[in-house]
A protein has these predicted regions:
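Internal alpha-helical scaffold of NAD(P)-dependent oxidoreductase catalytic cores
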Residues: 1-78, 133
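NAD(P)-dependent Rossmann-like dehydrogenase/reductase catalytic/cofactor-binding core
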Residues: 62-144
């Protein structure tokens, strides 16, 4: 108990939010952190690599993406994920999704796979009608 109290005090002092978890929940908790930290950076780097291959310098690519990243996170903080969600799937523009997928064929296969996986996750967790959105999305993605 003293150790837990000390840990909570340290977490608060560092600006964190103390959370008590069952040991069995810790791997999923850490997976959530990996999604929003390490994997977020992987997505940003993927965007930078695409832009550099299109002729941007790394610095210019980073500077081009940073305002979008900052605005997205700011909007998420203010309005939540669903209200912040933008892009072709959010507006039902599956022709653009198809064009994106075709364009990604020139990059490592993982880029295309990540785009498809994240598109499906977005539809599942952000769409107002997830089942219908996933059905339409899967029709487009299955053509690849």
């Amino acid at each position: 108990r003293r150790a837990q109290a000390a840990a909570r005090k340290i977490a608060r002092a560092l600006g964190g939010v103390p959370i008590a978890l069952r040991p069995s929940a810790k791997p999923a908790y850490h997976a959530a952190g990996a999604f929003v930290s390490g994997y977020l950076l992987a997505l940003v780097e993927t965007g930078i690599q695409i832009l550099t291959r299109l002729g941007f310098s790394r610095r210019r690519a980073r500077m081009a993406l940073l305002p979008l990243i900052h605005q997205t996170l700011s909007n998420f903080e203010r309005f939540g994920a669903r209200a912040t969600w933008t892009g072709p799937i959010s507006r039902g523009d599956y022709a653009t999704v198809s064009r994106h997928m075709r364009s990604l064929a020139a990059w490592p296969r993982e880029f295309e796979q990540a785009y498809a996986a994240l598109a499906r996750i977005s539809a599942r967790v952000l769409a107002v009608r997830p089942k219908q959105t996933l059905q339409q999305l899967n029709r487009v993605l299955s053509k690849r």
